[in-house]
C-alpha cells in the first residue's frame, strides 16, 4: 500500500500480468471465466461514514464472497495497525480471518478494494492456483481480482496529487487499467463510469491503449503499416533459412518455426488470453484460440 510515498507507474510487471491471465483461463476454463461477465456493482460495496464499521465491513465481505461464488466461506474482518493494507489467514476454512489496516477506519470507501484483493486470495487458495514468490503471487492476485470483476475498486482507490498519494495492490495504476481494459474488451463493459478518482481515468486510458496494441500486432490483420513491414522482412529472413526457421525474434511477439517438410509456421500470443497460437505461413488465415475461443483474422 503506497500511502503518501511515491507511486510506481508504467508497465514493469506486464509479462507476469499476461502470464496471470493465461493461467486464469487454463485453471478456470473459458466457460467459468464467462460466468464473471458482470462486475461488482458500486452500490453493493458502497461504504459511507455513517455505516457501522464492523457491520459494514462484514456486509461488503459477504458481497465479495457471493461475487466470487464462495458460498460456504465466511470472512471475519478486524482492524489493526500494520504496514500492509490487509492480510488474510489462508486456513482450511470455511472461516477466514481478514485483518485490515487501521487506516481504513477513517478511509471507509476503500474497504471494498482491500477486501476484494483478500477474498481473491481465498478464491485462488481454493483453486490451488499460485505463482512462486510473493511478488509474482500478489501480481496474480491483483490480476485475477481485476479480470474477474472486482479490481476496478483497486484502481479507483488510487489517488495522487502534489501533496499526497494512495495506491492499493502490487500492480501499477496503468497495469490495473490494462487488465480492466482486457476485461472490458471481452465483456463489452465500460468500467470508467464507476470511477470516483480522477487519476483512475487517466490510468485506465493508458491501460486501454496498451491493451489495444496487443490487438494490433502482426500477423493480425489489424497490425499497422510499420509492424506489417517488419513482419514481412522477418518472414523473408525465416524463409531464407532453408526451413530452419528464425525462432524467437527480439522486440516482436511472434516467432517463426519450421514444421518438418511442411510450410513455415508462425506463433504469436492470443491478444485476449496470451496463449500462444501457431499457424502456417500461407497468407490470410482465420485462427481460433483453443483456450479462450477468440477468433483471429491473420495475414501470415
Where are these regions (language model features)?
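Auxiliary, metal-adjacent structural segments of Zn-dependent hydrolase domains
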Residues: 27-93, 104-108
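A structural motif
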Residues: 111-118, 151-156
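N-terminal alpha-helical scaffold/docking segments in eukaryotic complex subunits
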Residues: 2-48, 132
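Active-site recognition of the HExxH zinc-binding catalytic motif
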Residues: 113-129, 146
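Hydrophobic (often cysteine-bearing) scaffold residues that line and stabilize catalytic clefts
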Residues: 53, 57, 112, 137, ...
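Pan-zinc metallopeptidase signature
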Residues: 1-15, 19, 167-300
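Post-HExxH zinc-binding segment in Zn-dependent metallohydrolases
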Residues: 134-169
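Short pre-active-site segment immediately N-terminal to the catalytic Zn-binding motif
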Residues: 96-115, 133-136
